[in-house]
From Swiss-Prot:
Family: Belongs to the peptidase C14A family.
Protein name (Swiss-Prot/TrEMBL): Caspase-like protein
Organismal lineage: Viruses, Varidnaviria, Bamfordvirae, Nucleocytoviricota, Megaviricetes
PROSITE patterns referenced in this protein's UniProt entry, alphabetically: CASPASE_P20
Origin species: Heliothis virescens ascovirus 3e
A Pfam short name: Peptidase_C14
Record's function text: May be involved in viral replication.
GO biological process entries: positive regulation of neuron apoptotic process; proteolysis
Length: 314
């Protein structure tokens, strides 16, 4: 790696996380007193990014006008102090490329364009969009719109792999799988059309299923695995490594939820404390390889030859 390669952006202390939680709009009768019906993903992303130094702003059940006003206010009045922006959108019942709002829907492209302002254009931005068409199963037995208790009792919810495998099967039986070539190309075309902003990473997962992902405790597979990867590697490696680890886990256990990842970054996006214009040392690279190998060993996917090769690299 060239010494002139910028290992990360010049990250300051002003990092913001914007969470747009529109999930209740799919099943308004299930809305709780605080305006939510599924807190798993929201709570997890706030916890993970707060550890990485992000200040969070949470908005729920917005109308189209309110959504425009809030994002415009954030970008126009405070963007000069931001060094990084992460936006997480949780929305159910929306079409591909749209965000469900209290009075209709809002195009994802139009939403992202709000961040295309001069002082923010060349700063790192990441959009994570988790959207599900679901909400087709009646849930009169439970106050939570996206609970999984129709399959398992609360005492069994720790078995993530088992739950995810059942949900993935239901997606194939009752809805179209997002892993099919036709649907994957539809997602990718949507992303190519809705990426008008520079220095941006978009993680877009659309599950056309009859079952809502988003258990109140566990959360959706994509959000869960992304946050798990960032908890482990968020301060020691660039964001693309964490995204790759997320993709690896989702592809293995819940292929129907595998997101499309699109980017137009010119530098590595790094949320840690590494200084700018620094080439990672051999020791740093070895530590990152070891960390990734531990996960692969736990999954039984690291062969003896791989282990010998890793030892030789040291």
């Amino acid at each position: 790696m060239s010494s002139s390669f910028k290992f990360n952006y010049n990250m300051g202390d002003s990092r913001i996380l914007v969470v747009i939680n529109q999930r209740c709009l799919a099943l308004p009768s299930m809305m709780s007193a605080d305006g939510t019906c599924c807190n798993g993903d929201e709570n997890r992303v706030i916890d993970t990014f707060s550890k990485l130094g992000f200040q969070d702003f949470v908005y729920r059940n917005m109308t189209t006008a309110d959504l425009k006003d809030i994002v415009t206010l954030l970008t126009r009045h405070n963007h000069r102090t931001y060094s990084c922006v992460v936006v997480v959108i949780l929305t159910d019942g929306a079409a591909v490329g749209e965000i469900k709002t209290a009075d209709g829907s809002y195009k994802l492209r139009d939403f992202m364009t709000l961040f295309d302002v001069d002082k923010l254009r060349d700063k790192p931005k990441m959009f994570v969009v988790q959207t599900n068409r679901g909400a087709k199963i009646r849930r009169n037995h439970c106050k939570h719109a996206s609970c999984q208790c129709l399959m398992y009792s609360s005492s069994e919810r720790g078995g993530l792999r088992r739950i995810y495998s059942v949900i993935g099967w239901l997606c194939k039986v009752f809805g179209r799988s997002s892993s099919s070539p036709q649907f994957a190309s539809q997602q990718l075309a949507c992303l190519n059309y809705t990426l008008p902003v520079r220095e941006t990473i978009v993680i877009y997962s659309y599950v056309d299923a009859f079952v809502l992902y988003g258990d109140t405790d566990v959360g959706s597979p994509v959000i869960y695995e992304l946050c798990t990867a960032l908890d482990k590697f968020g301060k020691s490696c660039n964001i693309l490594t964490a995204i790759t680890m997320m993709q690896h886990k989702v592809a293995k256990y819940v292929p129907a939820a595998l997101p499309v990842v699109h980017m137009n970054c010119t530098r590595l996006m790094h949320y840690g404390d590494a200084p700018n214009d620094v080439t990672p040392s051999k020791a740093t690279i070895t530590t990152m390889i070891d960390g990734c190998s531990v996960i692969l060993e736990e999954e039984g996917e690291l062969s003896d030859d791989d282990g010998e090769l890793r030892t030789a690299s040291k």
